[in-house]
């Protein structure tokens, strides 16, 4: 992240000049994208492969269980639609092989934060996706060809110029497919008006029944101060209808010692609010040695603030790993950690209000998929057909979110090209929840059909629900396919598949195996401000059982099978930290006779890359490509330090 900011001023000015060069200043410009497809409702027709043939009610409707607290009567019909049996083609069935096996999640959705909302929202967007897919098929059949000149569903960038609303009160820029790590929003304008204060809000989509959308990031610039100070201040916050405003984060801070780090950068740059010296020529005096008049410099003390009334500012909000970074005129100013359940993929609109004369706004690095007809190496990227007669040595489940198109393509072009993967000895699947945006879901569906390596989850993706994906990987590796070992990793991790297989063979253990970077002495984080905060209600004990770090760990088939069995019996304790959850599940299985064998491997790097790695985490698509090139050239695990 730090390397990015050194050149940000140059990048910002290039953006400014580029926008002025190519965009008519009098015409708001926005790259077109389709919005109608997902709203089309098609009358069911039994000749269509996605038609619903038979409704199978989930267990919570059949049995007198106390689950109405989780799913209300009004939502039962919507949720039941998730698990309708469908007559689909083999190609369309492939992404849904794990789907119905997770139906029992509905019974205990309330056990995790956002669980109930994730399933209810999934019911709504799934119905919309089915309608959109059927509508597209009708169009293709009627025209007998794919529509030429297809507009992008998820554009890579969007821009507007001088685009305030008619009443001059605000600007709104739609973000159809959310934000992802590396996305940035550059705002060029001038604080003006009587007050010169303004706000930038990144909002999501309102939940059904809620008139106002959640505010994922609220960036409030108060040039004349507020009730707490007369000096200019930046206030960062978030808002939801259920929780109202969160705790304010101010810059400059009242207490500089409370300046925490987000992505290794200060929440508030210490220079904001600090004194700066400026000199001015106030009078002339004679140089006593030469008799020459010279300017006498008088010192003026001012406090630094990045925005100034009447002066042009170039401000950029950039999505990092942990939060949002704000730079102004090339200087890092603030960082804002994403609040619990408010994640960047939820952003659907940017709103700018107040005394701010907008010159331009540019959203770039947006998540977008590659159109299959433009992918030169398409066949080499498709998942190989797996033979039911040949058991797999390893299933690798990759956590990914719906709009992380670029990360998935990077994985397909790099370590998924290992011979062991292409030959069918190892199967790799992305486990992806639904998105709240119909456009993203349609892109995801097309991607899943094209490459055959995506497993869709029957819930909307929230970070608090990732242990549901861990469960899904266990089910896929034992019930959908049959593998000796099951591995979990992330879409920003580079995996040396050959080294993993070699290490597993050297353990000479196929039962009770937990292989990874083992943590045998860790405690729950009790700080509510932490992303990994765990309350005493969630975990009352002082320590966790042994667990393996999430970027890359492996369990043997018997453990994965037992996890699936606990789930079917309703005895699987859900825990929001998925890697710790696996450790908790194994500890529970130990009480019932499992003899665990922990294999620690320090070559699994959970916080970046080190030479000799087996798994390297936090790698961008460009870094993944570089690591693959290094491996092909040297057959060694060498990091790309130049990136």
From Swiss-Prot:
GO terms for molecular function: carbohydrate binding; UDP-galactose:N-glycan beta-1,3-galactosyltransferase activity. Gene3D superfamilies: 2.60.120.200, 3.90.550.50. It is an enzyme of class 2 (transferase). Its main location: Golgi. Glycans are attached at residues 45, 87, 144, 162, 277, 287, 508. Beta-1,3-galactosyltransferase that transfers galactose from UDP-galactose to substrates with a terminal beta-N-acetylglucosamine (beta-GlcNAc) residue. Involved in the biosynthesis of N-glycans containing Lewis a structures (with the combination of FUT13). Belongs to the glycosyltransferase 31 family. This is Beta-1,3-galactosyltransferase GALT1. The gene is GALT1.
């Amino acid at each position: 992240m730090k390397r990015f900011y050194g050149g940000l001023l140059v990048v910002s000015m290039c953006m400014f000049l580029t926008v002025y060069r190519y965009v008519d200043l009098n015409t708001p410009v926005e790259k077109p994208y389709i919005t109608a497809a997902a709203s089309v409702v098609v009358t069911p027709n039994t000749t269509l492969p996605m038609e619903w043939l038979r409704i199978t009610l989930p267990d919570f409707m059949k049995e007198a269980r106390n689950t109405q607290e989780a799913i209300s009567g009004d939502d039962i019909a919507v949720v039941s639609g998730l698990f309708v049996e469908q007559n689909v083609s083999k190609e369309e069935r492939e992404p849904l092989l794990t789907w119905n096996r997770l139906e029992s999640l509905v019974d205990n959705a309330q056990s995790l934060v956002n669980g109930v909302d994730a399933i209810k929202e999934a019911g709504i967007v799934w119905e919309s996706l089915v309608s959109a897919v059927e509508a597209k098929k009708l169009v293709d059949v009627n025209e007998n060809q794919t529509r030429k000149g297809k507009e992008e569903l998820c554009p890579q960038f969007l821009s507007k110029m001088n685009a305030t609303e008619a009443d001059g009160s605000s600007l709104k820029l739609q973000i159809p497919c959310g934000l992802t790590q590396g996305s940035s929003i550059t705002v060029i304008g001038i604080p003006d008006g009587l007050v010169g204060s303004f706000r930038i809000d990144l909002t999501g989509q309102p939940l059904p029944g809620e008139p106002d959308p959640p505010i994922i990031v609220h960036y409030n610039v108060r040039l004349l101060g507020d009730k707490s100070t007369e000096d200019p201040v930046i206030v960062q916050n978030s808002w939801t209808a259920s929780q109202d405003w969160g705790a304010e984060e101010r810059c400059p801070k009242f207490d500089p010692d409370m300046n925490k780090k987000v992505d290794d950068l200060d929440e508030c740059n210490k220079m904001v609010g600090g004194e700066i010296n400026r000199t001015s020529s106030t009078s002339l005096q004679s140089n006593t040695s030469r008799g020459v008049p010279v300017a006498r410099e008088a010192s003026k003390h001012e406090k630094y603030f990045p925005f100034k009334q009447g002066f042009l500012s170039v401000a950029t909000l950039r999505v990092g790993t942990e939060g949002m970074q704000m730079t102004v005129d090339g200087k890092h100013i603030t960082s804002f950690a994403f609040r619990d359940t408010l994640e960047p993929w939820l952003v659907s609109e940017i709103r700018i209000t107040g005394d701010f004369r907008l010159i331009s706004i540019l959203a770039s690095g947006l998540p977008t998929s590659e159109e299959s007809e433009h992918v030169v190496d398409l066949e080499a990227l498709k998942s190989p057909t797996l033979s039911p007669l040949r058991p797999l040595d390893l299933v690798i489940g990759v956590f990914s979110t719906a709009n992380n198109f670029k990360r998935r393509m990077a994985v397909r072009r790099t370590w998924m090209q290992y011979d062991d993967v292409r030959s069918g000895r190892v199967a790799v699947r992305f486990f992806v929840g639904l998105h709240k945006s119909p456009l993203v879901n349609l892109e995801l569906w097309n991607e899943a059909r094209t490459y055959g390596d995506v497993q869709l989850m029957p819930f909307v993706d929230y970070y608090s629900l990732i242990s549901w994906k861990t469960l899904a990987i266990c089910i896929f590796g034992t019930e959908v396919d049959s593998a000796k070992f099951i591995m979990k990793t992330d879409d920003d991790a580079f995996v040396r598949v050959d080294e993993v297989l070699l290490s597993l063979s050297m353990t000479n253990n196929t039962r009770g195996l937990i292989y990874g970077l083992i943590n045998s002495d860790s405690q729950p984080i009790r700080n509510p401000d932490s992303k990994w905060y765990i309350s005493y209600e969630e975990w009352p004990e002082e320590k966790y059982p042994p667990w393996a770090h999430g970027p890359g760990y492996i369990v043997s088939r018997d453990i994965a099978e037992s996890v699936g069995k606990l789930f079917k019996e309703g005895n699987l304790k859900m825990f929001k930290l998925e890697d710790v959850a696996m450790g908790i599940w194994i500890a529970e299985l130990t009480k019932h006779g499992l003899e665990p064998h922990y294999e620690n491997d320090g070559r699994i790097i959970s916080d970046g890359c080190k030479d000799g790695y087996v798994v390297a985490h936090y790698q961008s698509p460009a870094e993944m490509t570089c690591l693959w090139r290094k491996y092909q050239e040297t057959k060694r695990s060498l990091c790309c330090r130049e990136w």
